[in-house]
Each structure stands twice: as C-alpha cells, then as structure tokens.
C-alpha cells in the first residue's frame, strides 16, 4: 500500500490551482468556478456508479480516483478543507448510521 493520502492530494490540488489555467487541468477547473467543477464531479460520479453496477473493478478503481480528485477540487473552490470533511466523518462514526440518519430526519 502506498503512503499517498487524500491530504497529499489536497495539497497537490491547492498548489496546481495557482497555475495558469492553460497549464493545469486543476487550475482550469478552479477558474471555471463551482458550476464547472461540480458538473465534472457529477459526471465522474456517474461513471463510477456505472462501473460499480457492471462489476468492472478496474474501471471502478479508475473512476473512484477521478471522483476523489474532483471532490477535492470542488471543496477547494468552496474553501472547505478536507479536515472539515474528515471531522464530519469522525462525528458520524461515533454513532450507528441508522441512528445518525434518524437524527437528521427528526431535525
């Protein structure tokens, strides 16, 4: 297993977002704003779902990487650090998923 993490990818996204858009796909997405980045995230998510449904493990791995990358771009544009998402995941894992869902529905 590699030592590469989502935090590493977040740092790469942050660095590449500073480049001129004609030199970096990340910078181009960021320059296009949230609508463009979110649309691309949605496209990649659909491709991942299709790979999952068809049982294409190799393509699912590839598309999952695209989803994670594009999610980090969307978070970058929204100025939401990955740390915030991880804190929310940690909060949610402190209780069962069914209890967490029920608490959202009663709010």
UniProtKB/Swiss-Prot annotation:
Give the superkingdom in one word. Bacteria
An example GO biological process term is: L-histidine biosynthetic process
One MF annotation (Gene Ontology) recorded for this entry: ATP binding
Q: Which InterPro entries match?
A: HisE, PRib-ATP_PPHydrolase-like
Q: What class of enzyme is it?
A: hydrolase
E.C. no: 3.6.1.31
Annotated localization? Cytoplasm
Is Iron included in the keywords of this UniProt record?
A: no
Q: Which GO terms describe its cellular component?
A: cytoplasm
The reaction(s) catalysed by this protein are:
1-(5-phospho-beta-D-ribosyl)-ATP + H2O = 1-(5-phospho-beta-D-ribosyl)-5'-AMP + diphosphate + H(+)
Name the UniProt key words of this record, in alphabetical order.
Answer: Amino-acid biosynthesis, ATP-binding, Cytoplasm, Histidine biosynthesis, Hydrolase, Nucleotide-binding
Q: In which pathway does it act?
A: Amino-acid biosynthesis; L-histidine biosynthesis; L-histidine from 5-phospho-alpha-D-ribose 1-diphosphate: step 2/9
What family does the Swiss-Prot or TrEMBL record give for this protein?
Belongs to the PRA-PH family.
Q: What is this protein called?
A: Phosphoribosyl-ATP pyrophosphatase
Native source species: Rhizobium johnstonii (strain DSM 114642 / LMG 32736 / 3841)
């Amino acid at each position: 297993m590699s030592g590469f993490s989502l935090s590493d990818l977040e740092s790469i996204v942050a660095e590449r977002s500073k480049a001129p858009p004609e030199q970096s796909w990340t910078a181009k997405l960021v320059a296009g704003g949230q609508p463009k980045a979110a649309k691309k995230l949605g496209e990649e998510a659909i491709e991942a779902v299709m790979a999952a449904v068809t049982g294409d493990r190799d393509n699912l791995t590839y598309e999952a990487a695209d989803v994670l990358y594009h999610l980090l771009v969307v978070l970058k544009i929204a100025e939401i650090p990955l740390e915030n998402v991880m804190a929310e995941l940690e909060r949610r894992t402190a209780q069962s998923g069914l209890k967490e869902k029920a608490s959202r529905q009663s709010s």
